[in-house]
Amino acid sequence: GYDQKGNLIRQLEKVTQKQVEFYMRDTPQYPHTSTIISELLKRAIKNEKDDIEKIIKLTNFVSEYVEDDYESNSISVFDVIETKKGDCTEHAQLFTVLARAAGFPTREVGGWAYDGKNRFIPHAWTEVAIKLDDDYYWVPADPTWDMIIPVVHIKSNAESILGKFSLILKEINFANGEKIQY
């Protein structure tokens, strides 16, 4: 039979222990131990116990909390929290901070996303380390578009073979006339 979970795991990148430690750090860019962050986290996930459901709730919360604003000039995640505005980078930053506060190693990634208008555009989203069976795997989450494991994204700036793929995208002739937008 078809093993959906096994098939999913084979497609995800395994997380190393070093990465778990690195992507749980509290830093000026990702100050996840702040009281303000803790309060926002409680609003986002409430009393949820299931890890996957927590990620779904966080993705949905950030998508609804942050209004799309491509002119946003947020300096920190606290600016994003205060203004409730931002582009994909602000969505990803707030999600990263909240997910780390919830105990999930999380990283921002960037690359290309299909926008449904026959083009790929520069985009930022996140990857969350989730335990599946006995190991941790990077699971993509896009809080801008409220998507878990988006199939329309091509990562280019994290530790992945797909990063090399973005370099040749401009050479591909898409069947429906899709374009790469820089």
Which ranges hold each PLM region?
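Acidic-enriched, low-complexity/disordered segments with a strong bias for Aspartate over Glutamate
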Residues: D3, D26, D50-D51, D68-D69, ...
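Secondary-structure boundary elements
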Residues: V15-G86, S160-Y182
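Extended acidic/polar, glycine-enriched regions
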Residues: G1-L12
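Hydrophobic/aromatic-rich core segments of domains that either
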Residues: H91-Q181
